[in-house]
């Protein structure tokens, strides 16, 4: 089966420079890679690699003047020797480009697609193939598939040259020199020549017979004379067709007729050239007469079609001497082809052997150059001496240059016949792959399926590989490489097609690492043997331009391949300075004889052998003592000391198991493992010695069981006594740096590698359950709401709500008790408190994410986590804040539900409870009595008998955010009781602004002296809800009798706003919505007092007279104080003279009573002087 992609040597290889970290190393040994590079093998050593027996055949195509070679490399010796081609008579320049082996008998087919030879100075390319037996020592067969014999096609060519007068002698001579040059260069070919000069007439200078007799161009044209007349081109062409191409003049009936016309001007005659329709006509126009497009088009009528191929315009005669090279190409097309198809090749450039494959002794080779590079493949006979060509059917123009046969690969089957896939990577620039059915009983090949590429220039079909995944003899997968595919910064793609009943169908694809747009992933694809021991074939894909090259390993799986590589090997990992690593790959043999598969990888001037490592599985066992952890030993207890609790002993055992049955060597694995306690928890429940949560150890493991003991203890307090303690084990292979990988140095101790599965194990140590003899705890939970602490929820800016819940466990221990509380979105959870018992029973709540804010919110509480013991009861208080802006109804409904992990479904009836709390909306009403209310009224016998009074009230209603719930309001106006007796009567009415009708209601209440302001009647008035309302209580007071005695009493009115108190409440208390006006009424009694006034006047006059007489008698009216004071003003400095003193003394004697105070003053002054 074909093992790797074939690449044309001329294809340029470009490398990109990108960085990518190495992939995991499963399971090829990179560090133990062995390199082979024989001296003088050339840079293309490693172009193809093929494992045969216990060695590797390496192809080294030639470069420059060197020839290609085959080398046989032995892994045991480390040397490569060239393969001797005994009996070969050919020089193989590109031997080693193609290698294939037959998996049934190990025979080897090596081909050189560049066997070249010259035929009439034209180069033919075909193939040269050698068939070897497995040991390369047996008889060798050689063959030349697609070999095309040099069949000389007969061509009779006539030069028809212009001899008109417009030609100068030197120009005419250059035409003759051109004809001589052509004849000399084609002298040893199957061409015959004749020459005719034309002007007004026509002259045969020499015919075909003359040329056969004497093939000397100089002698044949020695006596030519320039005619110097007109240019009758039409007549000249007809003359050649009828008079020159004649058998009696040497023309051959089987020869192709060719006419080359050389002229410097337009025709001077007219007509047609129907006689020359079977002649291939080239016309060469020379000179200044053909500078315009119109003049050039006059030549088209003389030439064959298409004119672009058969008309040539030259501006000077000097360019005639350089025209032969172009003319030779056109002549080459003619020679050896049929007259019906003058522009195609058959097998002349077949390059047969560019690809090859062998299966069940049946060999095929690709022939990309056949049929004008439409391509195809050759079915070789057993002796390689005969072949059958199979190509595109039908052979249409669009299949040309498709390169069918660039790759070929057998797709074996358990049936008698198999399929063959052949790639055409350049078909319509998209590429395609054709599937052919092998002929049965000497029949014909048949095309059964076509698979098309999808991206221009991707070289889809540039590499093919069939894969028998389960090794049952039936090819399940066809891998098609597109190494130039580009997408997502990845260069190259491999498409996976799976076999169906009617053909192959695309199922997936493989990709290389990103960052290598020119990496050519898929340049080489090969089906490896089972290298990882799972019984399925693995696949290697080369990407030679990812950095210095890379090889990807894809493991087989049932029904296909793993989409992710198990290993990516970079060339620099195996050898410094390597280039094109991964250009070819083959890995189906055990070269070392150790039972492990080896993979050969080609690079530039290198061949690398990578050994696979034995794949092992790790068997682990773990045991504990005690098997269950006693709860009473580790549970939280506040009466015990802080001493460490008893621990658990662990025994862990390891043993390796080989997954490669044929490997018989000794297995020793250096294992690194980690033990971890409760690794998924932040708070661990077990500690290794030293307070650590994990242990790391190394151990050498063999195929025998190895065991180790450990122990761990518990912290002071373990709260979670339900979930088992997890003991996790993680392990991996550990290799010391510098560990030798040379198996010859290590003997049979080849370092194994673990199977790429989850390298971890987890065990659980359960806690002992105190649930009776059946070891099964059955809880019975009950939840109920206690009488609400808040009888109603009053919606204010800072309102809160508290509810109480009672939770009980009536049966055995309950595990992971969870209390869920659903409440409306207007409430916001604040906190939870444990009311009773006052012990360390943990409770924690968290609000769950809202599923829909329009429905409800939920609270989840863990109670006594993790165990709620049997017979326990708790009382919880849940406190909520209110979100005033929320939408509220008439009540708040809270629903509680309690669950646990071990309650029977038949006991869930009392696990739910619901409470409903009414909602009261706030009303902000303020009532004030006005200053202009009548507060005092007085009645007198002579005063007005009727008084009009007013009691004024102002009602302010503040807007609320709950205006959607506006209550029905009513103003209740109380007026005084009607008098039962007395002279004063009163009547009352109510007016409101805005006006509303009021209903009068008599309370029929008797007057009560102790409660004088109790209303005797009520006015009930509906209130229009607005911010300000004015209420006037108007009264008429009338004096209807005589005032017999004075009195004073009070008349009171009142105003209050009433509403439905079951839905609303006063925001600032009921007093704010109540006002009262108290008015004092004064009744004054007046008696008849005229005679009393007369007698009082007379008595007053008599008293005044008596006072006057008394004053007169005492001399009050005779005093001369005025004169004395005026006399005193005449004394200087205010000091009386001596005469004055005497006068004063006399006066004092006459008026002792009036002057005594003055004398006392003087005596005091005098005394002061003494």
Curated annotation (Swiss-Prot):
FG-GAP repeats lie at residues 31-82, 83-141, 338-389, 390-445, 446-506, 507-563, 567-627. The keyword Transcription regulation does not apply. The keyword Calcium applies. This is Integrin alpha-L. It comes from the Eukaryota. It is found in: Cell membrane. Glycans are attached at residues 65, 89, 188, 649, 670, 726, 730, 862, 885, 897, 1060, 1071. Integrin ITGAL/ITGB2 is a receptor for ICAM1, ICAM2, ICAM3 and ICAM4. Integrin ITGAL/ITGB2 is a receptor for F11R. Integrin ITGAL/ITGB2 is a receptor for the secreted form of ubiquitin-like protein ISG15; the interaction is mediated by ITGAL. Involved in a variety of immune phenomena including leukocyte-endothelial cell interaction, cytotoxic T-cell mediated killing, and antibody dependent killing by granulocytes and monocytes. Contributes to natural killer cell cytotoxicity. Involved in leukocyte adhesion and transmigration of leukocytes including T-cells and neutrophils. Residues 1-25 form the signal peptide.
